[in-house]
């Protein structure tokens, strides 16, 4: 998602498109903008949510296999997102089922699984790799910081530290940045 949103932001910036570019992987927020502020939709990122992108990747990677795709998500609004017609390819949903983390937790408890007693294991390849951008992605302002870091590319560690310290992440106040 960060790679796509960074490229989209740079394209908008370089083409003189109207800014700011709004982004959210929250389907509730997207639906709110669609219904209450439709005039802002041209400024909303066209990138899919991580769930949508993973669903598309799975469908493409395993297109010749009978795969049932399940996403584990923190919010029930993701169930709505998965049911949107835009999240279908060739008449099939990109994600077949969404379980909330609460539902999964209940299932684990009912099955009597004790993670502390399970043997250690490594993530599956090739999708078990992760980046620092993904770590900050899930906090308020994390996507913005990850996009800034990506756009800056090979910036010095001091520059990246300055970005982290300037308060992109967090709930305090409105954040404003000049991009040149």
How should these model regions be labeled?
Residues 1-180:
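Iron-sulfur-associated redox domains of electron-transfer enzymes in respiratory
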